[in-house]
Swiss-Prot record:
Disulfide bonds: none annotated. The keyword Disulfide bond does not apply. SUPFAM superfamilies: Ankyrin repeat. This is Dilute domain-containing protein YPR089W. InterPro entries: Ankyrin_rpt-contain_sf (IPR036770), Dilute_dom (IPR002710), Myo5p-like_CBD_DIL (IPR037986), Vascular_dev_regulator (IPR052072). It comes from Saccharomyces cerevisiae (strain ATCC 204508 / S288c).
Length: 888
């Protein structure tokens, strides 16, 4: 049996612990109980078969292929189940011996292995056992013979093997990723009914009692208990089946191993009921208002606005197939979102620090997360971006703009704190008392002398107090000893000893030590300190995690924020007009202040895992593969703007990646990315500490080699404004000439001394495997699906119904460019009713129009949209041609 999977063996992590529901484990126990019959069989012809079963079921023994083959030669019928009611293939799957399946399939006797064989104990086929127990490796072996398997075979309860795949499980994701669900066809389950309880009025007297009973059953089901044999009835069925059975007044019996989630699964391949929202072009203004109100109505639920946009898009794209309506809806939605978060919406391009405004980072991170989910939903919608390539570019621009808005809000909060918390904040006394040549030394020396004299007097007074206390303690000790000898009271001796200890201990403490032992006062805590910088970066990290923003977008937000902060700090040090920062003493203090930020970065370090299920060839062409076929992509002529792509590097090269246009830059650990951005500042501070000690060109060259991120222009600029200490040597004039010659040789300009501030890198989009791993796996995967609560659905339906009735009451206005009537006319409503609200539509199939009045493949109804010009307004910079390079 040749493998169609090559070497794609998966580690089955579910083997080490129980899998499936409690009922699946009960069925597993029934099969294991049949092993007791093996020792009771006395038929010689069954000896080889029995030994083979014992080999399979012995969990303490490793797989012995040679022994298995020898015993298998003596077995005439590999499908025999007369001994225990269970065949060899069932035992192999139950005990997870996947490697034996191929040997059993290619048995020496030549008998054909029946892969649809049902056991007599539970009534499961091999595929049903593999799915219910989540034996992924067994599934691999079975699918190698997919042409021999009846995938639509049902058990006694009327369920197929597909119905036993637990949703959101690793097995479900594996089958979906490898396109194994293509063998699945829709089968109507004929589920047997049982008679209704006699006293139904007690059970279903009102809606509240039914709801309470349902939740009680769910709680008991989780605990492995039931109220009655019918307690599991229709609790995990689809909503449509559940409502149908409930309306019939009878409970249904389903397979207890069928553990579908109570809420169901969003079907991206079919247009199912309640998974799209009907609307018209005249509903768009009110839908946009509803969209913008969701942060207040549903705070931190970022899947709701994404689901609202996506379900409307599904209706326009798959139901009525109108490309203009899809693109207009997305354009207006993104414009409305961008306008609501833009702190500089009408201010134009950001060119100066004064133009920066502190926006609401909670709202901005909310919409960033919303758009990341919308991007994920559209990627799951097959070939959506190939049908609408302009949508991807617009989505890239909007996500990019919101990231810059969020970074701008953080940066403007940092700008006002850099001077007070980093440049002027000092904790080292020597830095405060340092004398500089440019100061009025006459007055400063007098002040310094007074401070030294005061400090000397304080120390002398402290010594005198210690001597007096010591003298008093000695006298008190002698006095206590005399009283103790006279009275003979041991307790007085202990008391005097305690007093002596207390007095002696007090000698070793002074006010200065006690001041450091106690926490700072509230006044001290309110003063600016480097902790303020840490708090702002911590707030950014918090809101990104709060809204479950994709890690690659989190990394980009933090990276740009640290980069803007580092470049601004670097330029502030070089531009210091008061010459406070350009000195070796202040350089030490600033470096010490930055260590607080370094500690926070180390404590909050994280690394975005690289996508595993994508090769370098496809990754280099991503995200262009979303809108074009691989053969049509030319890497030298990118068709998407403002987006970074993957550039492979040598695996043996462990150097840091400095190129932000390479998407690998953001797959480095956060502390390494921060190190790259902060390196120029750190190296400048190191230069300031050693510059005046250099006395030769050799020492200067070796120092420059150790500081590669600092250019000769910057080195010379720092020395021109350097603040020399009183006894510090001046920077060697020969070294200045050397730097000047270096600048002339390299044709550098002195204007290049400062780093570029507010640099905007390209956007990096997460790949589809990354998003699938993050959003489609795990117990919380249901919360990432584009479902909407009933309140939002009702709001959209009400908007559409009210507008529809208003349009019906208005006189019909014929269109000048088209002889067709308005989409919201009577023909539309009749057409919609004939289609059937409760039917599912396969979006991969071509839907033929049923009448000329409503052509689903035609755009006549949406060639002229009532676009709400006053509802959404883009910022002023969006009309600028240079927006792609620098929207700020």
């Amino acid at each position: 049996m040749n493998s169609v999977w090559d070497d794609a063996r998966i580690e089955d992590r579910t083997v080490d612990k129980p899998v499936g529901s409690s009922h699946a484990q009960e069925k597993l126990a029934l099969v294991k109980s049949t092993l007791f019959k093996l020792d009771q069989e006395d038929r010689p012809e069954c000896d080889s078969w029995v030994q083979l079963v014992k080999l399979i079921c012995d969990e303490d023994r490793e797989e012995e292929f040679t022994t298995f083959k020898e015993l298998l030669r003596e077995v005439k019928n590999v499908n025999d189940k007369s001994v225990t009611g269970v065949a060899l293939i069932h035992y192999i799957i139950v005990f997870d011996r996947a490697d034996y399946i191929e040997l059993l399939h290619d048995n020496p006797s030549g008998a054909k292995l029946d892969l649809n064989l049902v056991d007599d104990i539970v009534g499961y086929t091999p595929l049903m056992w593999s799915f219910s127990l989540q034996r992924r490796n067994c599934c691999l072996e079975l699918f190698n013979a997919f042409d021999e398997i009846n995938f639509n075979m049902t058990n006694k309860a009327g369920l197929t093997a597909w119905d036993m795949v637990p949703p959101y499980s690793p097995l479900s994701e594996f089958l979906e990723q490898n396109n194994m669900f293509r063998y699945r066809t829709e089968v109507k389950h004929e589920i047997p009914q049982i008679s209704q309880p006699k006293d139904t009025s007690l059970l279903m007297s009102n809606e509240d009692s039914t709801t309470k009973e349902t939740f009680d059953n769910i709680d008991l089901q989780v605990a492995g208990l039931t109220l009655s044999p019918g307690a599991n009835d229709n609790m995990f069925l689809d909503s449509d089946e559940k409502n149908m059975n409930h309306s019939q007044g009878a409970a249904t019996l389903i397979d207890p191993t069928y553990t579908e989630d109570y809420h169901g699964t969003f079907d991206y391949d079919k247009l199912s009921p309640d998974q799209y929202l009907e609307f018209s072009d005249f509903d768009i203004p009110q839908i946009l208002n509803l969209l913008i109100s969701l942060p207040q109505k549903e705070p931190h639920m970022t899947t709701y606005p994404a689901g609202l946009i996506y379900q409307c898009i599904r209706y326009a794209d798959h139901k009525i197939k109108s490309k203009p309506l899809v693109e207009s809806l997305i354009n207006l939605s993104l414009t409305k979102i961008l306008t609501s978060v833009s702190s500089n919406g009408a201010a134009g391009l950001v060119s100066t620090e004064a133009s920066l405004q502190a926006g609401d980072i909670v709202l901005q991170s909310y919409w960033l997360s919303c758009l990341s989910f919308l991007y994920y939903y559209l990627c799951r919608d097959d070939s959506f971006f190939k049908r609408h390539p302009s949508v991807l570019q617009e989505l890239i621009n909007t996500i990019h703009s919101i990231i810059i808005e969020l970074t701008s809000s953080i940066h403007c909060r940092l700008i006002s704190l850099i001077d007070s918390t980093l440049l002027a904040y000092t904790t080292i006394q020597d830095v405060k008392q340092t004398l500089y040549k440019r100061d009025w030394n006459f007055f400063k020396k007098r002040k310094q002398a007074k401070l030294l004299l005061k400090e000397k007097n304080r120390k002398q007074l402290k010594e005198q107090q210690k001597k007096e206390l010591h003298r008093k303690s000695q006298g008190q000790e002698n006095h206590e000893e005399e009283e103790g000898q006279q009275d003979g009271n041991d307790s007085d001796d202990r008391a005097s000893t305690n007093d002596d200890n207390n007095s002696s201990v007090s000698l070793f403490y002074d006010k200065e030590i006690l001041r450091h032992l106690y926490p700072p006062s509230f006044e001290e805590q309110m003063k600016p300190s480097p902790l303020k910088i840490v708090q702002i970066f911590g707030a950014l990290s918090y809101v990104l995690n709060l809204h479950q923003t994709h890690p690659i977008f989190q990394q980009q937000c933090l990276s740009i924020s640290v980069n803007w902060f580092a470049t601004t700090l670097f330029n502030k040090i070089l531009k210091d007009k008061k010459k406070r920062s350009l000195s070796r003493a202040h350089a030490i203090q600033i470096r010490l202040n930055l260590s607080t930020l370094e500690s926070w970065i180390q404590n909050n370090d994280f690394c975005v895992p690289k996508p595993m299920l994508i090769d370098d060839f496809m990754w280099q062409r991503f995200p262009m593969t979303l809108i074009r076929d691989v053969g049509e992509i030319d890497l030298s002529d990118p068709i998407l703007r403002n987006v970074a792509t993957y550039k492979p590097i040598d695996e043996n090269n462990k150097d840091l990646i400095y190129d932000t246009s390479n998407s690998l830059f953001y797959y480095q650990p956060f502390h390494k990315i921060a190190q790259i951005h902060l390196e120029p500042v750190f190296q400048l501070l190191q230069w300031l500490q050693v510059a005046t000690t250099l006395d030769s060109e050799e020492s200067l060259i070796s120092t420059m080699n150790l500081l590669p991120r600092i250019t000769p222009v910057q080195l010379l600029k720092s020395m021109e404004k350097y603040n020399y200490e009183l006894n510090e040597n001046k920077f060697n004039s020969k070294l200045k000439k050397f730097l000047n010659n270096k600048i002339k040789d390299s044709k550098m300009s002195k204007a290049d001394a400062y780093l570029q501030e507010h640099e905007i890198p390209y956007l990096v989009l997460p790949t589809i495997p990354e998003m699938t791993d993050l959003y489609s796996k795990g117990p919380d995967s249901h919360s990432f699906q584009p479902f909407l609560p009933g309140s939002i659905q009702d709001d959209v339906y009400e908007i559409h119904d009210v507008n529809f009735k208003q349009r019906q009451n208005e006189p019909q206005i014929s269109r000048t460019n088209s002889g067709t009537s308005d989409f919201t006319g009577d023909e539309d409503k009749a057409q919609y009713e004939t289609e059937g609200v409760g039917e599912s539509i396969d979006i991969n199939e071509t839907v033929e129009p049923e009448s000329n009045a409503f052509n689903v493949g035609n755009d006549d109804y949406f060639k002229e949209l009532n676009i709400p010009s006053s509802t959404a307004q883009r910022p002023a910079w969006s009309n600028n041609d240079d927006m792609e390079q620098n929207p700020w």
